[in-house]
Amino acid sequence: EEGEAPGASLTIAQEALTSLVNAIEPGLALTVLAQLLQAPLQRVAGWQGRYGIFIQGRTGSLKTSFCQTLMCLYGPRFAEPDLLLKWGEGATRNAIMSMAARAHDLPLLIDNYKPNTGGGGRDFVALIHNILEGGEKDRLNASSELRQAKSIHCFPLMTGEDVPDQDAASVARVLVLAFPWQPGTPNETLAHAQERSQHLQALGSAWIDWLEDTANAGVIKEIAGQLWQRQRAWATELTGYKTGMANALRVAANLASNELAFQVALHCPALAAVLLPVAAHHA
């Protein structure tokens, strides 16, 4: 992926991921991790319907630092500030759509949504809709020929202080997680992970290798096949919690696939070493 870190250590990567999970509330951290792991799993599992995660938190909730470090599962350069994709700061909707197409089966971090930048909430909701509906629009090139639109398979991970809520259908495509504010307090656990972020790609590589190993196809298929059953269970729970909830089935599908992606990850030995001791927090 984005650059290489020679000598990445799986053991150090596991230590770093353990710190990341514990740097924020483990239940929140594991939900984000499951989405990042689901991105390359999605097509292997035969699932349809991607979703985004929006991490809401005040300045000082460490949401960006956490996400950048976790993204290092797919390459150490995701920790570099210059590569951070910021909403409204040089990243137009068209530019982000182009990057989403290039991200293929990976997560895409879009940082720092603010309602008063980059076209505001309306543009942001349209962007979410376009990314998760699966592609760019067909356009004509300079020769008036139809240019082939690129399909999109990435999973957007977004951060911001305010959640855009202009469109119920688009919001239903996004799991919103509120990160607790950490008012100026040094987070030594997160710092421990950041100092070892260049090793995290060893875990990402182990995950990709495990997914590509045909010996694991059976367990992936077995867990993936529980999607509809888990979606119905989540829908029942959601409608019981909030009667008449709009788009309950869509939200339930997001929760079900996140849950099952985590269950698949527990079968990957490199990840299981980190995840099994904290698995009860992912609910």
Give the residues covered by each predicted segment:
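Ser/Thr/Asn(+Pro)-rich, low-complexity disordered segments
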Residues: 1, 34, 83-97, 137-142, ...
